[in-house]
Every structure is written in C-alpha cells, then in structure tokens.
Amino acid sequence: MPPTESTAHLRTIVVPTDGSHASLQAVALACDIARKNKGQVYVLHVIEVKRTLPLDAQLEMEEAVGDEILARAEEVARRQGFQVETEILHAREAAPAIVDEAVAREADLIVLGMGYQRALGEHQLGRVVPYALENAPCEVWVCRHPAEE
C-alpha cells in the first residue's frame, strides 16, 4: 500500500519503549508507516540515572532489562517484515533524552505509546507525553492503549 499524502513525509521515526504493550504497539505502527514510506525506525529505551550516580555508571541490571525490552521491540518489527535500529540511552530524565535523540536523528515523527492511566479519577499523561508535545520540533503521535475491562 503506498503512503498517503498526509504521512508520506514521515521517513525517520523515533519510538521510545518501556516494554509495555502500548509502547510495543507504537513500534508496530511506526514500522508500518516507515515501511510504506521507505523510512527508518529508531527504537529507544531510556535508563534514568539517579543524580547521585555519574551518567556513565554501570547499571548492569537496568541494561539487561533494556536489552530484553529492545529485543521484544525488534521481534515486533520482524513480525512485520521490518528491521529497526535500537539504542539504550542513559539520561537523568527520559523526556528530554527522547526529544534530544529525535533532534539528533532529524526525526520526522515521534510515536509515543501509553497505557490507560488514571489517578484520583483523572487521566494521567505522565512526564514524557507533555514534554514531547511541547518541545519536539517534529510531529508527535500519542497512541493510548484502551482501558482494560
């Protein structure tokens, strides 16, 4: 299927993942768009490093978890016949790291997957979504997973 006019310019796509079902669905969506547009998908996992540690601290357990998460994202892409590039980032906060990576890669789109989150009766966006919507120079799509019954 050829790209539509509204998505044909979306060739470089960044997708952060925490391994959640919603973020893996975002990977699948990004792969679908990039395949149609002959583009590339960069899947990121951000390890938030405490301020008491240096950014390059050896966080073996977090790295192992990140590797597993990125392997699942690669499997999602593989099932769609697509290959993604993956990277683990170390940062103090995930949101600025994601936007900075999108800028560095000259991304056309950031796809954010988020689960259905409610706290105190209100829907919560977390920290990444508002930051990306406010600061990313490219398009940002937020794909919210439906509430579980």
What are these regions (language model features)?
Residues 29, 62-73, 97:
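Short, solvent-exposed amphipathic alpha-helices that sit
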Residues 112-134, 148-149:
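Glycine-rich, Arg-bearing micro-motifs that act as flexible, cationic patches
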Residues 1-8, 78-110, 130, 147-149:
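Structural beta-alpha unit
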Residues 26, 53-56, 96-99, 122-123:
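Short, well-ordered secondary-structure micro-motifs
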